[in-house]
Amino acid sequence: MNYPYIPHTDEDIRAMLEFIGVSSIEDLFSSIPVSARSSLNIPESRDEFSVFKRLKEISEVNASLEDYAVFLGAGVYKRYVPTVVYDLAMKPDFLTAYTPYQAEVSQGTLQALFEYQTMVCELTGMEVANASMYDGATALAEAALMSFRLTGKEKVVVARSVHPEYRAVLRTYLEKRGFTVVEAGYDETGRVLLEEVDEETAAIAIQYPNFFGIIEDLDYVRSRSGNALLIVVVEPVSLALLEPPGSYGADIVVGEGQSLGLPMWFGGYSLGIFATKEKYVRQMPGRLIGQTVDQDGSVTYTMILQTREQHIRRARATSNICSNHAHAALIAAVYMSVMGPDGLREVARRSYSAAHYLQERLEDMGFKLCFSGEFFSEFVFNVPEDYPERWKWMMAKKILGPLPLKGFYPELGDTALACATEVISKEDIEKLLEAMK
């Protein structure tokens, strides 16, 4: 039977079978033992209308975050994304292009990635940024490897207040290669204590704001770093309000770019931010897009300094990162362009205000903050012992509550990490408070 979406006619199929010397399509599978064959148990075909109706019924079983009040942060955040972002980013011109190796036919994608790099530099206060990494965690691990290449040392001190899953990825990358990972503790403010730094330390890695939401004192961190390089893990939206790490002398800035227009799809897809000083550019992993002029004198863009193992000997490569998250970076570029500096600053301001209002209301109910340091849009507070069970109950009420922390930080006891972004309303907060009673 012929279908309009199948290119081969019955005559085409007969001609091909005759050419290869078999009488039917079934004969192509005759070598498969009968014992290995089974029915596919596929129902009879349906018309398009029936298929869409059935798929809609199945999809309605899923929970949509649009219906939930989300107080869950910890690295992935619910934010509002203007519709124009995906109208532009999902254009076939961008979606169908793979890696822009052939610069002469990829100028649109290359320019968008160049603009992404420029905006990341403006946000972080750094001199050069690459065209993206896989995610924030692997970007941190690559930063540590870069610090070893730059210093010739083999030890990194990472703050315990860095995202616990980032630290796990860091250890996975480093320890089997013989590198040393040492964790630095934190004080009652929630800020890092750097007592483990010595002359053998290649780099210090801290998060700003840290996993607890606390804004680290980068002046203190820089003063304690000695000759070690300073790696700062950032939440990019916060940098619209906070001083950029580059202004404190950070050597490498990495982070998760999901906040810049990407959805919360099961924790991804995500985007690794990576920026550094220009003098370190030849040790920077990943792809870098550069601007130049062509033979006619017109501005043009191309990939430069391709020191990946696809292009040079593995032993000399700075990274084995292959297909990076270029389209995610493009979405981030469109989002930052649409929002502009003022819009991004307003998103950060509203997130800060919502989180501090939530904190005040929780304290009014008797909940105590765990740390005294200033926070951005997340904070840790004490919760009842039965909170993990209550968290599940809140989900049934369409509330994604603050994250229980006991599994990540046993020393903190019964605590939770609360988050509020610009999409959280006072009504959402009251809904959470009612559930917390």
Swiss-Prot record:
Cross-referenced SUPFAM superfamilies, in alphabetical order? Answer: PLP-dependent transferases
The family database entries (Pfam families) matched by this protein are listed as: GDC-P (PF02347)
| Cysteines joined through disulfide linkages | none
Which CDD domains does the UniProt entry name for this protein? GDC-P
Which residue spans adopt a coiled-coil conformation according to this UniProt entry?
none
Q: Which UniProt keywords apply?
A: Oxidoreductase
What EC class does the entry list?
oxidoreductase
Q: What GO MF annotations does this protein's record show?
A: glycine dehydrogenase (decarboxylating) activity
> Is the keyword Oxidoreductase assigned to this protein?
yes
Protein's UniProt name: Probable glycine dehydrogenase (decarboxylating) subunit 1
This chain's source organism reads: Thermotoga petrophila (strain ATCC BAA-488 / DSM 13995 / JCM 10881 / RKU-1)
The organism that produces this protein has a lineage beginning with: Bacteria, Thermotogati, Thermotogota, Thermotogae, Thermotogales
